C-alpha cells in the first residue's frame, strides 16, 4: 500500500501485545526472513478484553513463539543507536482513558486491569528532529509525552499516535471533557 518492499525491512517495532497490533506479525515474519522485531519482554502475558457479555483473548498468537530468535525483548529505556530509542514503563495516570477498563491480563484465575507493561513507544531522531511513535497510547498520550521528555531532555518535535479514546468493545467514546483536556495538554 505504501510501495514499501517488506522483504527489505531490517528492523521492526511492536507497540504492544494486543492482536490488533500484532495480528499481522506472522505474515510479516514469513515474508521477511531477516528483520529483528523489538518488543517488550512482557509480550507473552495473557491479555484479554472482558465485558459483561464476553471474555476474549487478545494477546500474541502462540505460533509467534516459532520466531523468538527474531525478537529483541526490551525493558525500560533502550537506545538502539543515535536515531532510535524505545521506552516503556510509563508512570502516571493523568487523563487516563476509560476505554482501558475492559482490557485485562489473566494472572492465575484473576483478570486484573492490564497495566500495559507490554506497551512501548519509539523515538526516531533524524537531522536534529525527533518524532514520537506511540501506537494506541494505552498509558495515556499525556503520560507518554512526559516520559518522552524525560528520555529526550525536551519535548519531541512530532507525535504519531492513537489516543485510545474510544472503546470498540463497548462502542463508546470518551466524554468530550476528557478529549478536550487531552487536547489542551498537547
Predicted ranges, named:
Residues 1, 84-90, 130-136:
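Active-site-proximal beta-strand elements of phosphoester/diester hydrolases
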Residues 2-44, 150-160:
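Active-site metal-binding motif and surrounding structural segment of the metallo-beta-lactamase
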Residues 5-8, 30, 80, 124-125, ...:
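Flexible, charged surface loops at secondary-structure boundaries
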Residues 16, 37, 83, 134-135:
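Divalent metal-coordination and catalytic microenvironments
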Residues 18-23, 44-47, 79, 138-142, ...:
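Active-site environment of divalent metal-dependent phosphoester hydrolases
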Residues 23-32, 54-57, 170-178:
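Metal-dependent catalytic neighborhoods of phosphoester/phosphodiester hydrolases
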Residues 36, 115-121, 125-186:
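Cap/insert and terminal regions of metallo-dependent hydrolase folds
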Residues 43-120:
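Metallo-beta-lactamase
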Amino acid at each position: 500500500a505504501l510501495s514499501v518492499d517488506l522483504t527489505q525491512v531490517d528492523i521492526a517495532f511492536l507497540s504492544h501485545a494486543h492482536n490488533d497490533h500484532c495480528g499481522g506479525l506472522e505474515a510479516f515474519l514469513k515474508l521477511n526472513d531477516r528483520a529483528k522485531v523489538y518488543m517488550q519482554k512482557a509480550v507473552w502475558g495473557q491479555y484479554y478484553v472482558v465485558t459483561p457479555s464476553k471474555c476474549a483473548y487478545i494477546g500474541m498468537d502462540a505460533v509467534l513463539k516459532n520466531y523468538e530468535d527474531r525478537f529483541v525483548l526490551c525493558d525500560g529505556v533502550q537506545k538502539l543507536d543515535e536515531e532510535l530509542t524505545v521506552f516503556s514503563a510509563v508512570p502516571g495516570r493523568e487523563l487516563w482513558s476509560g476505554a482501558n477498563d475492559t482490557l485485562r491480563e489473566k494472572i492465575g484465575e484473576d483478570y486484573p486491569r492490564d497495566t500495559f507493561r507490554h506497551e512501548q513507544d519509539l523515538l526516531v531522531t533524524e537531522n536534529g528532529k525527533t518524532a514520537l511513535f506511540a501506537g494506541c497510547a494505552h498509558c495515556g498520550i499525556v503520560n507518554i509525552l512526559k516520559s518522552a521528555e524525560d528520555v529526550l531532555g525536551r519535548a519531541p518535535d512530532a507525535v504519531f499516535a492513537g489516543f485510545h479514546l474510544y472503546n470498540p468493545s463497548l462502542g463508546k467514546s470518551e466524554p468530550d471533557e476528557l478529549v478536550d483536556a487531552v487536547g489542551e495538554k498537547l
